[in-house]
Amino acid sequence: RQGAAAAIIVHEEEPAAYPWSVVENSWQGPQLDLQRDDLGAERVILESWIRDHVLDDVLKFTGFNYLALKEIALEKTFSPFPFRGLTLSSEIFNKVRYLQSHNIGAIKHGRTKPNEYILFMAHWDHLGKVKAVKPGDDIIFNGAVDNATGVASILELAKRYSEIDTERSVIFLAVTLEESGLLGSEYFAKYPPIDLSHVVSGFNFDAILP
């Protein structure tokens, strides 16, 4: 946290390669996280986003603009400084619910080196639903590319590997909640069912285009 009370991400469409609507759809409604021992105390109190041109409007009162500030922030000697006359206040009401999701995995045991592993993985989640803009619009983010193609890849690999012997063991893992911040992968890394130091190679499949 480095002493920060809040973290606000500035969205620029060109370098991000996705429009503001993706941010809106991802950050409206419930936000998911792992159940942590410190109950999230390591996170800042406020996490938010702002569009670059909206930030420019806000900064008019300070004598700065976003591009100038970005150049300053990229300098090796940069250190934080306050904006005179600019403050932020926010009021948040939230509720906590406990839900359960799953990583799904399978293992093919190796013939001569069963304690060494090749890992194939892909995330199975996507973004859920969006509010319809027009009547009759598809409200489901189907996720054919991100990431049904990735999951299909590890399923096909599992099918092919089931037909042959392998020297090392092979793990096929479909992780949850990638779109919420790689949470399924984080859980696997934190509570691995195997010794991760014995994973000799890993392949992640995400957004494979036809």
Q: Where do the PLM segments sit?
A:
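Extracellular/luminal Protease-associated
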Residues: 1-39, 43-44, 109, 117, ...
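Structural recognition of the beta-strand scaffold that forms the well-ordered cores
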Residues: 5-10, 46-50, 105, 117-121, ...
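Short loop/turn segments at secondary-structure transitions that flank enzyme active sites
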Residues: 8-15, 54-58, 112, 126, ...
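Acidic/histidine-rich catalytic neighborhood of metal-dependent amide-processing enzymes
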Residues: 15, 27, 100, 128-210
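Generic hydrophobic, helix-prone segments enriched in Leu/Val/Ile
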Residues: 21-27, 69-74, 187
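Charged/polar, solvent-exposed surface patches and flexible loops
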Residues: 25, 56-61, 187-190
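Soluble metallo-hydrolase cores and metallopeptidase-like ectodomains found primarily
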Residues: 36-143, 156-159, 163, 167
